[in-house]
Swiss-Prot record:
Region spans: Disordered: 47-101
Phylogenetic classification of the source organism: Viruses, Riboviria, Pararnavirae, Artverviricota, Revtraviricetes
Residues annotated for Zn(2+) 2 binding in this entry: C25, C27, C30
One of the protein's GO biological processes: symbiont-mediated suppression of host innate immune response
Protein name: Protein Tat
Gene3D superfamilies cross-referenced by the UniProt entry: Tat domain
Additional record remark: HIV-1 lineages are divided in three main groups, M (for Major), O (for Outlier), and N (for New, or Non-M, Non-O). The vast majority of strains found worldwide belong to the group M. Group O seems to be endemic to and largely confined to Cameroon and neighboring countries in West Central Africa, where these viruses represent a small minority of HIV-1 strains. The group N is represented by a limited number of isolates from Cameroonian persons. The group M is further subdivided in 9 clades or subtypes (A to D, F to H, J and K).
Organism: Human immunodeficiency virus type 1 group M subtype B (isolate CDC-451)
Domain remarks in the Swiss-Prot or TrEMBL record: The cell attachment site mediates the interaction with ITGAV/ITGB3 and ITGA5/ITGB1 integrins, leading to vascular cell migration and invasion. This interaction also provides endothelial cells with the adhesion signal they require to grow in response to mitogens.
Motif Nuclear localization signal, RNA-binding (TAR), and protein transduction mapped to chain: 49-57
Sites of N6-acetyllysine modification: K28, K50, K51
Polar residues compositional bias, start-end: 61-79
Stretches for region Interaction with human CREBBP: 1-24
């Protein structure tokens, strides 16, 4: 075995680096490729800065869509007490006219 330079960090010793380069693949083989791959891929630990997600800007199409929605006639208000009473009466009449077996 060759003597190792004591000034080198243990992870920079010859033979400590894998022969193949690290990839972006997340398969089991690539997750256990080296210690760096294991911490980043398998454990999900990343010490880098988190990227900010950009907000999606509203396009003109979506503004037109909003305008068309406001032009549509609105349905009955929820608090209107006069609306649903008539159909109930019809159902009651049908139940009275149809005798059970």
């Amino acid at each position: 075995m060759e003597p190792v330079d004591p000034r080198l960090e243990p992870w920079k010793h010859p033979g400590s680096q894998p022969k193949t380069a690290c990839t972006n693949c997340y398969c089991k083989k690539c997750c256990f490729h080296c210690q760096v791959c294991f911490t980043k891929k398998a454990l999900g630990i990343s010490y880098g800065r988190k990227k900010r997600r950009q907000r999606r800007r509203a396009h003109q199409d979506s503004q037109n869509h909003q305008a068309s929605l406001s032009k549509q006639p609105s349905s009955q208000t929820r608090g209107d007490p006069t609306g649903p009473k008539e159909p109930k009466k019809e159902v009651e009449r049908e139940a009275e006219t149809d005798p059970l077996d």
